[in-house]
Amino acid sequence: MKRLVIDTETTGLSPRFHKTLTVGLLLIDVEKSHLNILDQNHIFIKHDHYNASKGAMSVNKIDLIQHNQIAIPPTTACDQINNFIDKNILHETLLVGHNITFDKNFLSSLFDQGDTLSKFHHQHEDTMWMWRNLQKNDLVPQGRSNLETVAEHFGIDYTRAHDALADCKITAQVYHELIKI
């Protein structure tokens, strides 16, 4: 089954006040028996101002000066996202993410800034909530449910985390492990 894994890196926690810096898109074909990456894109977004929180920037480690040298305006970024969806015929493909509501809210804000309609499918599967449901049923250890904790439980390398595309790849591996349970 095809799934579109998404992740964002942002300047803070509120889409009303903070900006989307990068978007990772990872198209996968996944079943219990396999996980294959079919396509990917990593988009860097440039804004006129950032209102960056120190906490967010220390987590994602993005240098805004270097970022701005390769980043594109929100409208162009939205067009690239929609082109990725069109190219791969993903209009009805479920989204997958870890704490995906966070990413979807920032993407919605990005598309508003880009004055563009999103072509994302609205249904999604959230690996954080999948993990929490397993915790409720005592099928996995109790405790934190962040991506690092879940990835480490499954022995998935987390060293490249906090890069939108790398986080997509980690989330895809986590999703693959979760559907096996």
Language model regions located:
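Conserved non-catalytic scaffold segment of RNase H-like nuclease domains
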Residues: 1-108, 148-156, 162
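Conserved protein kinase catalytic core
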Residues: 13-15, 132, 173
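Substrate-recognition/cap helix-loop segment adjacent to the acidic, metal-dependent catalytic center
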Residues: 101-125
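Short, surface-exposed recognition loops or helix-turn segments adjacent to catalytic cores
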Residues: 121-125, 160-168
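Short alpha-helix plus adjacent loop in nuclease-associated cores
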Residues: 124-141
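A structural motif
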Residues: 139-150
